UniProtKB/Swiss-Prot annotation:
Protein's name in the database: Nuclear distribution protein nudF 2
UniProt KW keywords: Cell cycle, Cell division, Coiled coil, Cytoplasm, Cytoskeleton, Microtubule, Mitosis, Repeat, Transport, WD repeat
PANTHER family: F-BOX AND WD REPEAT DOMAIN CONTAINING 7, WD40 REPEAT PROTEIN
WD repeats: 123-164, 166-206, 210-250, 253-292, 295-355, 357-396, 401-449
Compartments (UniProt record): Cytoplasm, Cytoskeleton; Cytoplasm, Cytoskeleton, Spindle pole
Main location: cytoplasm
Coiled-coil ranges per UniProt: 76-101
Subunit structure and binding partners: Self-associates. Interacts with nudE and dynein.
One annotated GO molecular function: dynein complex binding
Amino acid sequence: MSQILTTRQAEELHKSMVAYLSSLEASKSTAALREELVLPDTFDDATCKKYAGLLEKKFLTCSLKANPSKDNGLSALQILDLESKVAGLQAELSSLTLTSRSKGGQDPDNWLPGPASTRTFESHRDAITCIAFHPIFTSLASSSEDCTIKIWDWELGELERTLKGHIRAVTGLDFGGQKGNTLLASCSSDLTVKLWDPSKGYANIRTLSGHDHSVSAVRFLTSTENLLVSAGRDASIRIWDVSTGYCVKVLRSSDAWIRDISSSFDGKWLVAGGRDQAVTVWEVATAEQKSALLGHENYIECCVIAPPTSYEHLATLAGLKKPPAPSSSCEFIATGARDKTIRLWESRGRLIKTLVGHDNWVRDLVFHPNGKHLISVADDKTIRCWDLSQEGKLVKTIDNAHSHFVTCMRWGPSATTDVETTNGVTNKGTTKSKFQCVIATGSADSCVRVFS
């Protein structure tokens, strides 16, 4: 027995030696060494695989200690250690689900925001115009009429950085882009759309020019990697390829200011609403307008396409015998306007319900991921929760959510995974949602609040 190694260390070394020979497919040598070392019966082929590569790593570690790199001040051993830690963190991040990051003990499906915010962020010098959650990290972006964008850590309650580049009010934000390469898009009254790269310290990597007036809203097309949509006061909807910066399509139906846009979960449909009191429905592939929703009596401030989780409840409201298939997109739409109402529509143009309760302009809407609730904010300083399973009944009101108009709202990041059927085939139309119980609101009081 070696006097340097303990019994356990010697046994680990012997196992790694056998695993090394086994990986070389040297069966005779492996068998001979096994017999010579008298390894226990529990060291079977499956256990042997766990030791694969261990001997090489030990040799490399010793080699690096003897020959440190002097190129960048770090030894090669330190670099190896850092690479190992990075790999471990990446594995941990991959295994972390969105729901596991929510507070334990909550029932996400029935969660609604409470009367008190958990975080209040104050740094902007003018009204908040839009907010957006990073899809993976606990970063929250806010835009303001003070011409800046601020990035917050909404869990720690810290301001991470301030982005400057726009020269007039920043009016819209959205995170999106290729998987693993998330970008932040912003739009402004300075007629531009800007792209910021979080992986490069939120460097402004591209500016998209083409609008002839203030840009009001910007959205990444869901389920596409490179397409971004913007709309504005020049009455146009522009679709951009963010990888090239080129405008690939321009949609236009009237001369009215477009205030908001929304895309379907599969990126095939767009809806837009604005000053002409109409909501238009567009097919992205053909750039054709498919329908117009008419009924509001003042400017439309917000529009959102209903998720498939809401189809069951909205189909009942619409008097349908059965809900549309979950794989279909843009079946129902919710809109909010300066006429103080929220309207629920079939995408073909039929009004199915008008929700009345706000005392001022309705500024933003978001569907609860469970599909059962619709949440709204307005210039009456309230957050209101509507139960679609009870014919759109108002079930909760948070008064004085802010000290001034509540201008915008977003739900925290959600993820959906395809559900496998019993025969193992993936059903693209049936998804399982994982989401966090958190929403953020912005206000004309220059504050951002987080409810979680």
